[in-house]
Amino acid sequence: MRRALRELAARHGRVLAASWRQRHRRPAGWFDPVETEFLPSALSLQERPISPTARWLARILMALAAGALVWSVVGKTEIVVHAAGKVVPVGQSKIIAASETGRVARVLVADNSRVAAGDVLLRLDAGVTEAEERKWRVQAAQARQDEARSRAMIRALDTGRAPVLAELPADPGMMAAQSYLDSQYADYQAQLRSIEAAIATYRRELGLVTQIAHAHRGLRRDGDVSQQAYLEKEQARMTLEGRLRQSEAQRAALQTQTRRQAFETLVLARKLAAQAEQEIARTSAQRSRLVLTAPVDGVVQQLVALTEGTAVAATQPLMMVVPSGAGIQVQAQLDSKDIGFVRAGAPATVKVGAYDYTKYGTLEGKVLYVSPDTVVDDRQQHSYRVTIALAHPALEVDGKPRLLKEGMAVQADIRTGSRRLIEYLLSPVARHAGESLGER
């Protein structure tokens, strides 16, 4: 038994020694894949090393991360402001509306009619306005006649010659005014002659009575006549002097009153004439506003159904004139938060809603105008209006140019500058940190 154990131990020793001597000369593939699973860790790694794929994958990911970091620091991206809008004609479509309330007298155009600037589109009934204008013209003519008649009367009073209305046209109205003026002047002359005749009579009688009174004064000193007789003659003289002064005062009053009446009539006539001229201008302007004309060359669109006698309210849109041959542009609405970065001349990229921009491309443009204040749309939202000029008014669709049409929906991407990618990535974090660190 002992012998057998010694032989077994010797045999295992020889095998181990032989294996140790052959340990560096072991051929590849000594163990099959199943056997390697049961080898010690060192022998298992030595027999089947780890694949380098994971190591290279990690290296590639680290290189990509480093490249992305460098690109975010060095690379820049454009800052774009988005504004939705539509295609409009240059100069805008002109909305035609009545500025006065009235009734339709005649419609002179139809939908899609071509019109030139100044063509009459629609007439409103001007009967009431014309009647009012005629009334004021009559009053103005009457006031001018009164003014001319007053000036002629004043000249006649200054010169003593009969008044003549030479400054008015020779028409029945002038003849009637001249006749009325002649009658006025004749009445004045009749009163004046009557007073002057009385003055002349009083002067003659006064001269005679004065001589008699002076004679009685001498006779009284000599004692030939009584004191009473002298006083009677002196009283008669003083009575005639009083009547003479009264007549002269009547003549002066007549002249003053006639002149004052002429001046008052002149002032009133000028005032009435000025008022009538203002009313004539007002009614004439009102009558002209009842005729609606085309402001530009174009095509009539969106004509409201109108018939003769239809009531039209002031500012009610009746039709639209789309300018022809004026080109197109983009009108977009810009949010208030973006207005601080948009300036006239900024480049813009326009995407047309009717055509997929990823397939048919975009249009380049430039900002022409930015409204100085916000405008309010139908939804009571405030926004700024931006006008963009297009470099080309057409897109290449299936090899053919397609012109844009008025009213097409578009989106304008307005380029306002550039920034580094790292700023874009870190700005939300910085903003959040700046806002949150100061909170209570």
Swiss-Prot record:
InterPro entries: MFP (IPR050739), Secretion_HlyD_CS (IPR006144), T1SS_HlyD (IPR010129). Keywords: Cell inner membrane, Cell membrane, Cytolysis, Hemolysis, Membrane, Transmembrane, Transmembrane helix, Transport. Its main location: membrane. The keyword Cell membrane applies. CyaD is necessary for transport of calmodulin-sensitive adenylate cyclase-hemolysin (cyclolysin). NCBIfam families: type_I_hlyD. This is Protein CyaD. It comes from Bordetella pertussis (strain Tohama I / ATCC BAA-589 / NCTC 13251). The lineage of its organism: Bacteria, Pseudomonadati, Pseudomonadota, Betaproteobacteria, Burkholderiales. The gene is cyaD.
